[in-house]
Amino acid sequence: HCFSYDNNKYITFLAKTNGTFNIGDDVVNSYMMFNNFHTGRDKSSILTTNISVWCSNTFLNAMKDNSQFKIGITHRVEYSSELDSLIKHKLETALRSNEEYKEQATTLDNKQIVENDLLKYFILVYNPKLLPSYEKEGAGYKALNSVEGSNLTQIKRCYGVWHDTIESNGKSFKLQNTGNNVRNDTYWKAFNCVTYNEDHLRGGSDNVSSRLKNNFFTNGKDNIKTKAMDTALELAVA
């Protein structure tokens, strides 16, 4: 697969590996990812990403430790045998990390989640400072209307994704291809609500370049998907 965006300044190539795994009926494929830039300043990069078959959600497992996995190559560097060996070593390490991602996904899928804990999770991901006010207001979705702070829109959107809906201009619309139909009410499903929001909703449906850059370079705005995974794991094993 190849994606060109931001007036052809950014090009991303995806090559499927043999790292596919299943969580029940949910299917996650693993890809090698090569990012090339025509900006005059950015380095080309090589890393890996995991993509859900059902909803095209992405998760850059390698983003959690750029020094371990990510390789940056300028256009001025000559491709030598030493560089070739380095790249192969880094790619092998990154592919092994996909096994870790499978274990994490399994852990999340083994922990059921209820409505109030679901909202608490989204708050902890997007703005933990809201939690005291949210709990003071009695928790539950209605409590969010009495809470003030940043990223409330993202929290509400994730909650909507859980229920396959999105609100816009006072109206509710049905979301398609969320992957909820193949997931149980677990932290794995909750985590995927965050990745769906970051990949498909945040930034607006008319700003494809912005969303693709979020998907392929930062693991969601401010690397939020990594935080979502770490938070879900903490709650799932508590």
Task: List PLM regions with ranges.
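A broad, low-specificity signal marking well-ordered, structured residues that form hydrophobic/aromatic
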Residues: 12-13, 32
